[in-house]
């Protein structure tokens, strides 16, 4: 009995371990779980029968053989289970590249097979839609290239005005009114502006027309009777004129009588004047001493008009000449004292593209003080699109005048746009996306490269400055023409990746706004908050 106790203790433990091992294999198998469960139940029933047999007859040989087999299977199952758990702990976690499996797969695995097949059919339809979208993007690119050719003569004229090759006329310099910018076309009304004449007005107009016809000498038979009536009325008016002529002599006689009466009154006035003269004679003796002085004063007064009349004419002429001569003389004296030459009007529009680029959001902070004297030689910025059959892309061309900084007259920056669908990117059809950008090499003159700096050190012994060969990159606008290259294998560093993202944004801004509407960047209107709060659609403005 003492020997049977350890067997009775170990057997149920072995059976329990066997059941755990079978359960773990059933979970790992997936679809074969039902078959494994059935086999496990059969094994459990057999083991249960063997355990019951061994408990009833511990001395029989069959019970010993069954117990030994069950114990051996239990020990093997326990050892295999322990090794599996240890191996799972030792395996490291998968890398990030291995975890690129989309999370939607886990959801699809739970769906029935029939539903999965339908979902795959929808994926194939989406791929066809992406192909249509590539055709749409290519058509947009062709339209941009077509209308860029229409804008080319306008851009050429802008280039000529900026660089003083063409002087605009007065009509071109006039500010266009808002009516000329209106997008609504005015319809021409065919209806007459004037109201139709009334019945009485029609008769008056007909009479006026007939009178005009008479003056021209045309003969109208219908109007002859009316003309005769008018001629008959004319002699009736003549007697009135004669009566008026008869009245005229009567009025003349009355005027003569009035003149005679006035002539009678004149002697009375003369008598009064004589009486006044006698009064003056009575007063005159008191002022006899001053008679000579009065006569001298009279003679002087007579001579004064002649003396004053002659010099007044030149005095007036001098007053007229003073405002014409004095300011010019004063200005000339001031210029002679200061020694400054007369300022001449600048030619063209100086620093046009420098001002434009400084007002661009992402590009302005890149321009350093050392870049400004170089960008003053920038004469034009143009945009060219790729030809048909080539990958979709566009190139910016920066034209420079001859300058002492580099030998290039043309600097280019090319952007290539992704035009093929990517199965790993489910949102390919959301518009343009720049895939790659390429710059150009700048042929700098000696000591004029602003994109790099050289380090200098002062040794402690000699104290002389030694130039080391190590070159340090410097912040500059011209780094825009040397972007980091995208490797075919591997990844970019976070710093280079951020530079490319900002570079793509700058290329999109130049493509959409700067080339087409550079004048608004030059005047600074683009940075006005009024233009940021509203959006322009033709001649109408809508709030965001």
Curated annotation (Swiss-Prot):
InterPro entries: NAP-like_sf, NAP_family
Chief location: nucleus
Entries under Pfam families matching the protein: NAP
Subcellular location(s) of the protein: Nucleus; Cytoplasm
Top-level lineage group: Eukaryota
Annotated Basic and acidic residues bias: 207-228, 235-277, 314-332
UniProt tissue specificity: Expressed in brain.
Protein family: Belongs to the nucleosome assembly protein (NAP) family.
The protein's name: Nucleosome assembly protein 1-like 3
Organism this protein belongs to: Mus musculus
Gene: Nap1l3
């Amino acid at each position: 009995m003492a020997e049977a106790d350890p067997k009775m203790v170990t057997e149920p433990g072995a059976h329990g371990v066997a059941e755990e091992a079978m359960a773990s294999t059933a979970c790992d198998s997936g679809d074969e779980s039902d078959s494994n469960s059935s086999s496990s139940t059969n094994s459990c029933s057999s083991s249960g029968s063997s355990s019951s047999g061994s408990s009833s007859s511990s001395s029989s040989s069959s019970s010993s053989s069954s117990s030994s087999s069950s114990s051996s299977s239990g020990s093997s199952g326990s050892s295999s289970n322990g090794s599996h758990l240890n191996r799972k702990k030792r395996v490291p976690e998968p890398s990030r590249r291995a975890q690129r499996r989309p999370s939607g797969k886990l959801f699809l695995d739970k769906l029935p097979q029939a539903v999965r097949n339908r979902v795959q059919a929808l994926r194939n339809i989406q791929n066809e839609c992406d192909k249509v979208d590539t055709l749409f993007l290519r058509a947009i690119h062709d339209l941009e290239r077509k209308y860029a050719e229409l804008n080319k003569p306008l851009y050429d004229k802008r280039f000529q005005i900026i660089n003083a090759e063409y002087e605009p006329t007065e009509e071109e310099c006039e500010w266009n009114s808002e009516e000329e910018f209106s997008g609504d076309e005015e319809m021409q009304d065919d209806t007459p502006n004037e109201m139709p004449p009334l019945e009485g007005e029609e008769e008056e107009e007909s009479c006026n027309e007939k009178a005009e016809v008479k003056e021209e000498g045309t003969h109208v038979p219908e109007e002859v009777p009316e003309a005769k009536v008018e001629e008959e009325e004319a002699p009736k008016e003549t007697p009135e004129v004669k009566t008026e002529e008869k009245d005229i002599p009567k009025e003349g006689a009355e005027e003569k009588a009035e003149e005679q009466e006035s002539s009678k009154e004149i002697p009375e006035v003369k008598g009064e004047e004589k009486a006044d003269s006698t009064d003056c004679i009575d007063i005159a003796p008191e002022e006899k001493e001053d008679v000579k002085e009065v006569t001298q004063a009279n003679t002087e007064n007579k001579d004064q008009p002649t003396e004053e009349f002659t010099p007044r004419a030149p005095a007036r002429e001098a007053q007229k000449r003073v405002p014409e001569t004095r300011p010019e003389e004063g200005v000339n004296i001031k210029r002679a004292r200061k020694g400054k030459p007369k300022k001449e009007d600048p030619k063209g529009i100086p620093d046009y593209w420098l001002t434009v680029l400084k007002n661009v959001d992402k590009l302005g902070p890149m321009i350093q003080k050392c870049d400004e004297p170089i960008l003053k030689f920038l004469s034009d910025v143009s945009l060219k699109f790729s030809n048909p059959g080539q990958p979709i892309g566009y190139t910016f061309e920066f034209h420079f005048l001859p300058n002492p900084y580099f030998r290039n007259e043309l600097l280019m920056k090319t952007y290539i746009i992704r035009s093929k669908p990517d199965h790993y990117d489910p949102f390919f059809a959301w518009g343009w996306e720049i895939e790659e950008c390429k710059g150009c090499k700048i042929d700098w003159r000696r000591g004029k490269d602003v994109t790099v700096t050289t380090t200098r050190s002062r040794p402690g012994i000699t104290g002389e400055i030694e130039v080391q060969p190590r070159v340090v990159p410097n912040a500059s606008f011209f780094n825009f023409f040397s972007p980091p290259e995208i490797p075919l294998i591997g990844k970019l560093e976070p710093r280079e990746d951020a530079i490319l993202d900002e570079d793509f944004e700058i290329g999109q801004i130049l493509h959409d706004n700067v080339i087409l509407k550079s004048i608004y960047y030059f005047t600074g209107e683009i940075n006005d908050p009024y233009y940021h709060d509203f959006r322009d659609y033709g001649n109408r403005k809508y709030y965001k």
